[in-house]
């Protein structure tokens, strides 16, 4: 069995996820590159963000924090053994494991990346969120037909593992 490490970022207010990268060896160079990617001037996920909260894992090395701070984002290491202070990230990890990864047999890094990409889209566009009044975070624009229950269609991802039901357009 091979262990892969997934680096992701989550915007706490909107719950938007950014899958930064997947690797077998999250060394200093890889972490620095991921930090550069998310702080890029035009397309970085952390642009116009003030803080980056992270746990005290040694993977968040000083050079990673320096690159993040060079992008005008203050890094804040959470106290030890305090997962409740990072509850949204912890919940996303649990959700992706239970709803997706635990039900798949992944045959390498590319299949992991594919599953994560599909789950990220499902999480953003098709999955209701209790903490957000059971609405979709970023719904796709649709022309739903109201009052006609026979016009419901099912959209599937990952071979039917992830399902989403919506009203068909007329």
PLM feature spans:
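Charged DNA-binding/catalytic regions of mobile-element recombinases
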Residues: 1-170
């Amino acid at each position: 069995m091979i262990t892969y490490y997934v680096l992701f970022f989550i915007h706490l207010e909107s719950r938007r996820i950014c899958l930064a990268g997947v690797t077998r060896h999250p060394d200093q160079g890889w972490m620095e590159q991921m930090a550069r990617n998310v702080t890029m001037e035009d397309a970085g996920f952390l642009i116009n963000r003030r803080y980056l909260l992270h746990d005290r894992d040694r993977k968040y090395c000083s050079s990673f924090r320096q690159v993040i701070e060079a992008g005008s984002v203050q890094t804040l290491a959470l106290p030890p053994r305090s997962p409740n202070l990072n509850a949204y990230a912890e919940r996303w990890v649990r959700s992706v494991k239970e709803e997706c990864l635990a039900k798949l047999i992944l045959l390498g890094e590319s299949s992991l990346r594919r599953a994560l990409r599909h789950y990220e889209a499902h999480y953003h566009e098709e999955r209701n969120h209790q903490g957000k009044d059971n609405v979709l975070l970023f719904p796709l624009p649709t022309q739903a037909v109201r009052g006609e229950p026979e016009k419901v269609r099912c959209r599937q991802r990952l071979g039917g593992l992830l399902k989403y039901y919506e009203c068909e357009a007329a």
